Amino acid sequence: MTEENKSFYITTPIYYPSGKLHIGHAYTTVAGDAMARYKRMQGYNVHYLTGTDEHGQKIQKKAEELNITPQAYVDNIVAGIKELWEKMNISYDDFIRTTEDRHKDVVEKIFKQLVDQGDIYLDEYEGWYSVQDETFYTEHQLVDPIMEGDKVVGGKSPDSGHDVELVREESYFFRMGKYVDRLLKFYEDNPHFIQPESRKNEMINNFIKPGLEDLAVSRTSFDWGVRVPGNPKHVIYVWVDALSNYITALGYGTANEEKYKKFWPADVHLVGKEIVRFHTIYWPIILMALDLPLPKKVFAHGWILMKDGKMSKSKGNVVDPVTLIDRYGLDALRYYLLREVPFGSDGVFTPEGFVERINFDLANDLGNLLNRTVAMIDKYFSGEIPAFKANVTEFDETLVAFAQDTLKKVEEAMENMEFSVALGSIWQLVSRTNKYIDETQPWVLAKDENDREKLASVMAHLAEVLRQTGIMLMPFLTVAPSKMFAQLGLTDEAHKSWESLSTIGCIPAGTKVEKGNPIFPRLEMEVEVEYIKEQMKSSAPKVEEKKEEEPKAEEITIDDFFKVELRVAEVLSAEPVKKADKLLKIQLDLGTEKRQVVSGIAKFYSPEDLKGKKVICVTNLKPVKLRGELSQGMILAGEENGVLSLASIDQNLPNGTKIK
């Protein structure tokens, strides 16, 4: 491939727009952006894809809660996501939305092809389903399974820890097992396909070796998605819908496949470790079935955690990237994300660590080196950078060799997606250059006219290393390098290119420096740590401190209370009552009998939410008809600020147990 037509295709996951993005989402996207910028600087024709996965049950439910259409709901959130990426200088080349016709039309074609060739078939499915993850699990995959004897009756998702429910419905299935041997052979022939290596072992041992079951690829319990061609009661599920974005965005399956032919297969899919399975098992198998090339690499990064675990609004520990950018600048955040956590491992965000990185690395090391250099050139040479000469002082050659070695380390680290290592190498060069100042002591050289040549060499070397440092930082930081070049007086773009790093001393003699403000001001540690902590707390749900006093209920005797019969009941099923927005018709198991009750909780619970719940039922109420439906009791709920919440029990008591 010639220099002019070498291509590089990198993708992030397409994000699920169910709420505001946090620093964890920014982490993936900044990493992809750094890689895209690096490859562009190396002369590659880069295509950097990101986007949003906008279909599914969660989106539909959230939209219904807000009484708006799912499309209106996702349009609003996607606008916010795009604003965030603009604020973070994310240089994506395309933003794919799964609600766009260019995507949906091709997904329909892909699904039909897979049906026509026998890879997808129609059957009935029963399995454990997590609404939060929109994923089915086998009972062997469940965490904390709930048992009744030797039978699994519930449990939690292994991915998110949310409750699962037993779902039985008609579904289309993908014959996964048909491709297992080919997939394992592909792993063997392409040992670097899954990175880090530990993820590959996890996929083989946890998912493939236990037996890869056929995969449900359609749903009938919601309708927000791409319809199955010829059977519109089915919605194409996330595996075929969302994963296909990587080729639909390139125009695959359309009249214009120019981008697809140019960029596919992808050089790297960047994904979070929680979705490795989908990208390294399901997606390769789908591509095999379509007889398409597989991506060259899937790189699974870790999570940015907090001291108390994953970010959660309920914990009050969510870090909003916008808050950090507005106060500390974009580069401070980008640097922290890429330097603090080795890509592929989990890392812990702390306010203290964030402020320390700014003060020690950015302000002290880099900022101070630039300030000292520009100030000395201004003082000793009237602001003009002297001509570069090699080996004038005994320390010059060592510094130049260190800089050249740093370039090799950075390039090697970037090829391995080791952003933290690359930045660490650059900062070693910054430290070595600060040491060079101490070794050469320009303030001493300036006192002796006979040392004028040495002093000039020191200034030229400092300016040159800062030029190289600025260039090597350009994939990672999008603001500071330009400020560095401005203070060094560099205006020729050729002197800021990656290619120019192979030429030592290319700053023209007489280039005028321009003193400026510190590119990274030092921060007051205690003040800023407290500020960040307060911002994190503000992400927690607001708690009302004071409630209005409610009217006291009329006093009753204990005998009056005992007239009410309360029993534990389990919800077997629920469905909306026709022409009644607030009512659900609920079937209950009371141990010795089944009953139907009608309850006004439809605005707060979906039928899927209720199935399997243990509730408290008033069982000796006189039966009544509500909207034509018989109600044989009442389930208890509490109300706060117009929101209902069902009363429940904290022990798994048998159905029918009397509440005393």
Curated annotation (Swiss-Prot):
UniProt GO MF annotations: ATP binding; methionine-tRNA ligase activity; tRNA binding
Gene Ontology, cellular component aspect: cytoplasm
Pfam name, any one: Anticodon_3
Family according to the record: Belongs to the class-I aminoacyl-tRNA synthetase family. MetG type 2B subfamily.
Group of enzyme by EC: ligase
Motif residue range(s): 'KMSKS' region: 310-314
Organism: Bacillus cereus (strain ATCC 14579 / DSM 31 / CCUG 7414 / JCM 2152 / NBRC 15305 / NCIMB 9373 / NCTC 2599 / NRRL B-3711)
Any GO BP annotation: methionyl-tRNA aminoacylation
Entry-linked Gene3D superfamilies: 2.170.220.10, HUPs (3.40.50.620), Isoleucyl-tRNA Synthetase, Domain 1 (1.10.730.10), Nucleic acid-binding proteins (2.40.50.140)
Assembly behavior: Homodimer.
E.C. number: 6.1.1.10
Function: Is required not only for elongation of protein synthesis but also for the initiation of all mRNA translation through initiator tRNA(fMet) aminoacylation.
Catalysed reactions, semicolon-separated: tRNA(Met) + L-methionine + ATP = L-methionyl-tRNA(Met) + AMP + diphosphate
Highest taxon of the lineage: Bacteria
InterPro entries membership: aa-tRNA-synth_I_CS (IPR001412), Anticodon_Met (IPR041872), Met-tRNA-synth_bsu_C (IPR004495), Met-tRNA_synth (IPR014758), Met-tRNA_synth_2 (IPR023457), Methionyl/Leucyl_tRNA_Synth (IPR015413), MetRS_core (IPR033911), NA-bd_OB-fold (IPR012340)
UniProt cross-references to NCBIfam families, sorted A to Z: metG, metG_C_term, PRK12267.1
Domain tRNA-binding: 560-660
UniProt main location, coarse: cytoplasm
Cell compartments where the protein resides: Cytoplasm
Chain positions recorded as ATP binding sites: 313
Protein name in UniProt: Methionine--tRNA ligase 1
Keywords recorded for this protein, A-Z: Aminoacyl-tRNA synthetase, ATP-binding, Cytoplasm, Ligase, Nucleotide-binding, Protein biosynthesis, RNA-binding, tRNA-binding
Motif 'HIGH' region, residue numbers: 15-25
